[in-house]
């Protein structure tokens, strides 16, 4: 069975971590002093547990794929800045009263989301529904031979030096999305949205707006996750889930 591509940045590190990266704790302490005891995250402990593929989920071979909803995306799906009980996929699971599999991979783009979608389609039992929360339409993955076997892709955003605008990633990613829509058409409930306003506009999908912020002050907070989960659930139910 071909394995899905997860968050390679966490592979090779402990599977359980208290911070997203090496700078997160310092940033949190600064935010704690500034925002004070009324801040939701002031005394809230968060642990990030990852499976052997780098997903914030149980091991792939233990999942009941055929009776689950699968959510694919970037760090907003994986729940950076939030405790597992507060992230959108956990809340969606509570609303739908069925398993929800989190295939969020931090920092990744539409290309990897579509690769995982294809691997899901070809290798795993067909789920009850698929949700694509599209990342920035400008991001892309680049294969690297300099990294070890578990970290073969690096991900580029427009503000980073290696970014190659000549490849016209907006148009490429639009084609990835079109292919993914065709892949799942008429097979199951399929819902698309994005937290990125430009992506939502270009792809003509729902824009899941940011209402509050997580502990890292960069991602959705608890209220945003609740709103996202409710929107996803409503749209899946409209499709017969």
Task: Describe each model-derived feature in a short phrase.
Residues 76-78, 106-109, 135-139, 196-200, ...:
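Short, solvent-exposed loop/turn segments at secondary-structure junctions
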Residues 110, 114-117, 222-233, 237:
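Short, amphipathic alpha-helical "lid/cap" segments that border enzyme active or binding sites
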Residues 172-184:
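A short, acidic, amphipathic alpha-helical segment used as a generic capping/interface helix at domain edges
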Residues 75-80, 105, 158-175, 214-217:
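Surface-exposed cleft-lining segments at the edges of enzyme active sites
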Residues 93, 201-222, 228-229:
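Extended hydrophobic/aromatic segments used for targeting, binding, or gating
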Residues 49-111, 116-123:
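Serine-esterase "nucleophile elbow" of acetyl-processing enzymes
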Residues 1-70, 123, 128, 134-166, ...:
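N-terminal secretory targeting modules
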Residues 98-104, 129-133, 189-195:
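A structural signal for short, well-ordered beta-strand segments and their strand-loop junctions
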């Amino acid at each position: 069975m071909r394995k899905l591509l997860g968050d390679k940045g966490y592979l090779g590190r402990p599977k359980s971590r208290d911070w997203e990266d090496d700078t997160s704790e310092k940033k949190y302490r600064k935010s704690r002093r500034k925002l004070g005891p009324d801040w939701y995250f002031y005394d809230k402990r968060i642990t990030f547990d990852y499976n052997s593929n780098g997903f914030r989920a149980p091991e792939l071979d233990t999942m009941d794929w055929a009776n689950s909803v699968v959510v694919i995306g970037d760090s907003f799906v994986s729940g950076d800045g939030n405790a597992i009980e507060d992230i959108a996929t956990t809340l969606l699971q509570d609303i739908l009263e069925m398993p929800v599999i989190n295939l969020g991979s931090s920092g990744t783009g539409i290309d990897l989301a579509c690769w995982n979608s294809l691997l899901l389609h070809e290798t795993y039992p067909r789920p009850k529904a698929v949700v694509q929360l599209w990342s920035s339409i400008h991001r892309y993955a680049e294969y690297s031979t300099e990294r070890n076997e578990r970290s073969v892709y690096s991900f580029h955003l427009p503000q980073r030096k290696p970014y190659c605008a000549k490849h016209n990633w907006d148009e490429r990613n639009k084609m990835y999305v079109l292919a993914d829509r065709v892949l799942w058409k008429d097979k199951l409930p399929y819902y698309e949205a994005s937290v990125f306003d430009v992506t939502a506009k270009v792809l003509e999908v729902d824009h899941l707006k940011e209402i509050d912020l997580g502990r890292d002050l960069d991602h959705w907070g608890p209220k945003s996750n609740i709103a996202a989960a409710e929107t996803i659930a409503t749209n899946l139910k409209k499709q017969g889930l």
